[in-house]
């Protein structure tokens, strides 16, 4: 989950060139439906790609098929597609916050919104989480929608925390929205349910928890080396430092590491367990393998 710079591609100029270039496979269809495509591009720009305000599936099947072809095999006017694919967002997935991006995908799914198949502002670097949300981009009311990495400035704020409950040796992991005045909790929760929970985030955090259980410093890297017994104040300081480091490393507070650490910071039970674990291992009263 990360705010990205909006691509500077002049999509409307490219559309006009495609309309007049007889060497382009889609030219006859774009020429026939140019006014529709032009209006749809303007609609997207005026509404920041909001799925509640952008109406899809109004172009012909023939044009849709040609646009899909161009997306898979871009010609010279569409080189920006290859550039977006190659540059990506190498430090974090803009949709879910994982430390990976493997592809370029559509914010508004091409199955339901074919008008924007090659539209640069609808093409976002992503990991496999975007395909796992399938065609779900909005819910039952206009507060329920997936965040748009190009347009949702709230992504620069901390929006999501992990939560840990039950037996802290192997806790139940979930996600909670962090309220702020810029976006409804319902929007954050929809993104959590539609994107985060369908990703591998919970499995990743479960694995990280077990690594932390064996050696807390492996995950909370700001804990000093050596046989130092920590106070709760020490631990809280190290957690905040680590959270800040991960925010800076990934250039967003909504990466998986920061969500994980934020969940510990916000849980008295998790912090006490971690403090007891760290000090017990340091003093030899707890085996890292127990």
Model regions and ranges:
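N-terminal accessory alpha/beta regions
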Residues: 2-81
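C-terminal, charged low-complexity interaction regions
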Residues: 2-18, 191-290
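Generic hydrophobic, helix-prone segments enriched in Leu/Val/Ile
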Residues: 22, 28-41, 71, 160, ...
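Short, intrinsically disordered, charge-biased short linear motifs at domain edges
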Residues: 77-84, 111-116
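Short cysteine-rich loop/turn motifs with clustered Cys
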Residues: 82-103, 127
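Glycine- and acidic-residue-rich phosphate-binding/metal-coordinating active-site segment common to enzymes
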Residues: 101-185
